[in-house]
Amino acid sequence: MRHQRIFGATTPLLLGAALLFGGSSTAQAACGLQSADNKIKHVVHIQFDNVHLRRDNPNVPSDLEQMPNLLNFMQNNGTVSGNHFTPLISHTATDILTVLTGAYGDRMGVPVANSYGFFRNDGSVGFSSSFLYWTALAADGKPELLSENGKIFPAPWAPFTRAGCDVGAYSIANMEFESVPGDVRTVFGIGSPEDIAVSAALNLPRTAANAPARQAPSTDYLGIAVHCALGSPLCNNSHARADALPDEPGGYTGFSALFGNVNVAPVICAAAPAGCNGSGAVKDTDGGVIADPYGRPGFPNTFSPLAKQSLGYAATMLEAGIPVVYVYLADAHDRNPVPLDPTTNLPGAAHAFGAGEAEYVAQLKAYDVAFGKFFARLAADGINKDNTLFFVTADENDHFVGGPASPANCDGIHVPCTYAQIGEIDTFLDRLLLTQRNNTTPFDIHFDDAPTFYIHGNPGPQDPLTRTLERDVDALQVTNPITNRVEKLNVFMADRAEMTLLHMITSNPARSPSFTMFGNPDYFNETSSASTGLGHDCSQAPACVFEGPGFAWNHGDVQKQITRTWMGMVGPGVIHAGRDDRVFSDHTDLRPTMIALAGLKDDYAHDGRVLIEFLDDHALPKSLRRSENFIELAQVYKQLNAPLGSVGLDSLRLANRSILGDDAGYAKFLATIADITTQRDALAAEIKPLLEAAAFDNQPIKEQQEDQLVRRARAIIDRVADLAHDEHDHDHDRH
């Protein structure tokens, strides 16, 4: 869910410059994908937000079951896995950026989302959005996408554009503008005509009459981009700007891009007029103009595009000769669009649905219709499973917070479900700590069901201030307003040492939280403000625990219901396995698998690995064909290195128990987990180059190598498992 990213609305601007094409508008760059048999001509990446393969109510068909046009396309023509996992934390920005890069948050800079805290030099805490354009500086002054060497992490479009392939992006995290005016200034420059116009619109008084004008810059600039190959006619015009990637390995000069609908639509509508309305506005799959709530053509809303909008824009991009397209689709379990409030002229309050509610079912039906039209339209264009690689996934799944469905036999399709109680349970942690523990330690958190804590002054892990707050947070109990049961908020606590093992600590120490509470998934945890009882105990209004009906689907946490998601692949080189859950994978595996199938290569080693179990031998280099050595090493590597593999989950159990124990035991834990992490990282650093070389350099893994590395990995896995399950002496190491 991206409900944390609420942008100020904006105003109609400049921007109707005439096209100055240097070549034919229907031409395209010579895209040189190097797939097996040269069959792949297009790549379509579809990224869902919180759409489920599994059923949330056993009687109600799942989200994907209610989208048979998509589900059948994937299962009949490729492979769908429901044994696919997120990183930690399991929130939208981190999950999508992990998919796009094939790297965990410690390497690409954003392990906490959809915003994250950082410590200033004086020990105070600031916050930055996890959604900014790829090359933007975050609020801490460092690159948003901060690599392990302090540079901007390599961009996902660069291998494609270097191969001569234009890349389109629609609402996909950080590949296009995410914030105005900040991202406009990053690309166009402070004081540029674009910046002046956008800033003027955003600075208009916040009145109902000004709402359309204040929204216009978002409509014009957010959410849409085309990254062009060298010499692409799509960027040979006055709409293009330099596509600057100053830290890209090997250099990246001479490339251009189109940013925002105001610059993209004129170009793709000239190249593919059937996808537009004749006035330069792109149409959705139903034939309506894609527009904001006030009717202005462009990016439709604050990053919650409907299927018909995302797929309609994607189809027009493909028809305009853009062979690689990334698109994002909003979830279907929240009301979308939210009607405008007649008083403020702004979108009204959010509203969440439970499984099987009539409006939820209707929205899924609309998604299904959109996919049917999308696939039919592409097929008519000659874009299909025989020449196109389709990757589809969901950022994370969710835990539903609400009472039981009524009637008990409702299925949503024949009998609609209703819910007497629905909505996440919100808490004010600072007021609960004051009331129950008399703890007034100043801190900030990233609001979430798995909040990251930032203690003012940035005390160390063994500082009494930190140790006391961790124990007091663990001791908090609340009464669930839905069930009337008394419950703990904490489930697992992770300190900095454990977060390092879980790939949650970046190269900038200032971004390191004091600790993370992976909490009870029914609760969304916040801190209070002046209007919500700041400084007052829970005997005073407003309540410290209450049900919020706007949102009912929690994620960010560690529970399998949230972290176990799904992925689907269709296209040349993908086996037709249908539903196949035998292989554990996570989001880092999608990027290397896509790049390998396309015959390209990234400028860095992935944290994931190519999923050869789902690929045809003919699509693989000889080094991977029927390679049991690769498979055995890759599978044990995932259990060793993935946050939700064996080592990650077992170490989290160990960490929680140790953090909440006595100081002497905690000191022993710190030494033990540091040793485990050092050994794990060193072994992973040996394994990753072998997996990469086998996948991208045709260098087979030798059996002797594989046997030795697998034995070492299993020794670490077993060691952590023994420590995690040794309740009597968790510091005793049996190995």
Pin down the residues of each PLM region:
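Active-site His/acidic residue clusters
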Residues: 314, 319-366, 402-406
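A Trp-anchored, charged/polar loop motif used as the substrate-binding/catalytic surface
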Residues: 30, 291-319, 369-377, 462-507
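Polar, surface-exposed loop/tail segments
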Residues: 480-511, 582-585, 589, 600-632
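Short, structured active-site-proximal loop/turn typified by the sulfatase FGly-forming signature C/S-X-P-X-R
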Residues: 54-107
